[in-house]
Amino acid sequence: MSDQKFISIRGAREHNLKNVDLDLPRDKLIVMTGLSGSGKSSLAFDTIYAEGQRRYVESLSAYARQFLEMMQKPDVDQIDGLSPAISIEQKTTSRNPRSTVGTVTEIYDYMRLLFARVGIPYSPATGLPIESQTVSQMVDRVIALEEGTRLYILAPIVRGRKGEYRKELAELQKKGFQRVKVDGTFYEIADVPPLDKKYKHDIDVVVDRVVVRPDLSTRLADSLETCLKLADGLAIAEFADKPLPVGETAEGGSANKSANETHERILFSEKFACPVSGFTIPEIEPRLFSFNNPFGACPTCDGLGTQQAIDPNLIIPDESAALKDGAVAPWARSSSPYYNQTLEALGKAYGFKVSARWSELSEEARQAILYGTKGREITFHYDDGLRSYQTTKPFEGVIPNLERRWKETDSAWSREEIERFMASTPCPACNGYRLKPEALSVKIGKKHIGEITEMSIRKADAWFRDIDGSFNEKQREIAARILKEIRERLQFLNDVGLDYLTLARNSGTLSGGESQRIRLASQIGSGLTGVLYVLDEPSIGLHQRDNARLLDTLRHLRDLGNTVIVVEHDEDAILTADYVVDIGPAAGVHGGKVIAQGSPQDIMANTNSLTGKYLSGAMEVAVPAERRKISKTKRLRVVGARGNNLKNVSADIPLGTFTAVTGVSGGGKSTFLIETLFKAASRRIMGSREHPAEYDRIEGLEFLDKVIDIDQSPIGRTPRSNPATYTGAFTPIRDWFAGLPEAKARGYQPGRFSFNVKGGRCEACQGDGVIKIEMHFLPDVYVTCDVCHGKRYNRETLDVLFKGKSIADVLDMTVEEGAEFFSAVPAVRDKLETLVKVGLGYIKVGQQATTLSGGEAQRVKLAKELSRRATGRTLYILDEPTTGLHFHDVAKLLEVLHELVEQGNTVVVIEHNLEVIKTADWVIDLGPEGGDGGGEIVAVGRPEDIVQEKRSYTGQFLKELLERRPKRSSQAAE
């Protein structure tokens, strides 16, 4: 084999890999698949990508290396045939509130350039374009008029300002000027009548009187320059005899004609300045349109587009509460009588009692409590038991008081307390567009840059394709290359199924799949060749309908001359690959071997490959023999959901069932389920402060006692958090060790076995097991602590043994081994067995939370819920729980979810995976398209009902699946 044609890996042992030898064809689309935790990412990211990136960075100078994060050398004997590597992982792009889809894809940078070069500023006062001209352009415009036209050349020194202007007129006379036009009438300067200083005046200085003829240029240029100096960049050519004929232009005149022309005069400006309002724009440069630059950012919100403001709904969370029972939330916790006595005084003035509910108060009384008495003085009587006094003053109002204290306080605690009652609102100065008025006055095709970023990518693409029709020849020439870059990038975003996003969408609000596909679009835009791309499940969050477009994109990346390695479980992706590598046979310590490799057909033919069995149909996720009965009375009903793109949606979710919310990306699933139902229900039932999206009402919440969103966020942000601490298994483990005879003899308490507190932990590394050493030109090195040798505890703590194992040995066991080891200790065993049940038997009991993938973190949370005593009245909400799961893992996950439902709970999932949708009792399909074209209920009912609906894309793909695979017994979950 020639090394140039293959990436040759020898002896890969990173994480759980078992000395893997592998030859991967270059310039091909390669899919790595296998069970969750089998070692796919260890091979693709931690070995191949890490080595490719490390070698590239190593080739740079020491100075350059200090700015780049350098990967550790993977545990591998040899890798040949590598190219510089780029990884596109499942991480949200950026939590920075200044990062948007437009900035990440660089489309916004090109838009700034386009607006700076061909945008036309408009006056907010007149709505007319503001143009800047050179003296030569002004001269050309005048010479282009009909020969013999008589003109006054005027300098408008005063525009609509009050004053007498005697001094200014005297100065003009000294300089040799003789005539002025005051408020529309011509005068000799000596004869100007006294001006009333209470009224606004217009004064134009007559600089010259000319008759248009071809040899006028030099004199005209001098006169215009004098005007521009006198009037701060403005000059007027006014017709002495007749007005400018309608539509009159000399040859070439249309291109030069100023939009500031009337039939009596032509106004010239050498600056971007409105002659009417004086609204000026500095020189138009790309930075004027940057909300990350003080030159362009809105000064009120500093370019964020939002402001923190006190939200009246958080001040009065429950309108049915009485004033004396804490209706005013910021005052509710205080034990001081001050607040009640304040309300009593306001009650006397506005005619209400403190026993009244908020909903019973008059509008005037509500406004007085919230926003103050606006100068009306109120007599307050205060008595705190120690002293009594009376004061008469206006009442400031709850909201102004909180806003003032928030601005004035230096205490972080006070600020945090007040922020509990604040919400983000669009900035009133820029309406959420993030830019200064000057930037928003510049338009192309009657739209400013902010309006275009608010369009969906689909609409923006159409707008940019049509816009050059409105350009003149010069503008077209300038814009051509910029438009090409913008159109290409928008096309790539369309191709990866993101046409429903807006360019203004905050990067932090994107799902992992969306942000990965955005980075994918940016990579295609860069047009690199000879690169090794490593991708992590790019199909996440993508409906089957858009899958083909994504796969086309990956093939396009390959056809440019790149090697594309994709870690993926999606059936279509595996079948479209040039080469498939199946890692297994199971997860964790039971994985790490190459089970099968070759074409998709080779994988299907391999009897050892679990993936092959699912692809060929030998195994499958079974459709339930019968679905649960749907109760007509026990149901949740969401009425009038209108958040984001939802169009007044009302839908029922039957309680005690497994419901799937489906639809294309951007159809409104997350808005309906997470932003509306979950936030509203958790606010009502759990007392959370989350802000739900707009809706009318939700019925049926009385049937629930808990609402839990099991998402893919990390279970802990520090290496000290692990599955044992999160699920609560670590507490009984520590208790058990503290109860052992050796521990009792030494007087050890459970705290002795914690690595978070002094006592039992190793103080050299403070219980971390490793010590970080900063290396400025190399990656930071974590060296194993030489005192405890990575065990995290001191020697005395490690002397306490159970069945010959110390607490450190227990943390190093896999969950499966731990469950067996503690088989006689139900408090520990039961919690660890739930982790095994959700398919996490392969992770370590003490594995650092930061090393778990999103899918693994979600299943740890699921295990925690399973181990709780069931009330049968919980609503579980999961957003794409099959992320990172192999077909076989999906079958296991479904068993767990259905077990939660069997306990009487309700499980609702947002899901694109047809294997999950086909097992649901009830399906709500939103769409039909993404973005503006979505937000409606397309179909609702059992999966068999969904396939009948012609408009439902989910139904079309589900129909194929149900017809292709007949119902079978539960062979899959063997």
Curated annotation (Swiss-Prot):
Keywords from the named record: ATP-binding, Cytoplasm, DNA damage, DNA excision, DNA repair, DNA-binding, Excision nuclease, Metal-binding, Nucleotide-binding, Repeat, SOS response, Zinc, Zinc-finger
Subcellular location: Cytoplasm
Residues that bind ATP: 34-41, 663-670
Location, primary (coarse class): cytoplasm
Zn-finger region bounds: C4-type: 762-788
Superkingdom field: Bacteria
GO biological process: nucleotide-excision repair; SOS response
InterPro entries associated with the record: ABC_transporter-like_ATP-bd (IPR003439), ABC_transporter-like_CS (IPR017871), ATP_grasp_subdomain_1 (IPR013815), P-loop_NTPase (IPR027417), UvrA (IPR004602), UvrA_DNA-bd (IPR041552), UvrA_inter (IPR041102)
Subunit structure: Forms a heterotetramer with UvrB during the search for lesions.
Family from the record: Belongs to the ABC transporter superfamily. UvrA family.
PANTHER family documented for this protein: UVRABC SYSTEM PROTEIN A
Biological role stated in the UniProt entry: The UvrABC repair system catalyzes the recognition and processing of DNA lesions. UvrA is an ATPase and a DNA-binding protein. A damage recognition complex composed of 2 UvrA and 2 UvrB subunits scans DNA for abnormalities. When the presence of a lesion has been verified by UvrB, the UvrA molecules dissociate.
Protein name listed in UniProt: UvrABC system protein A
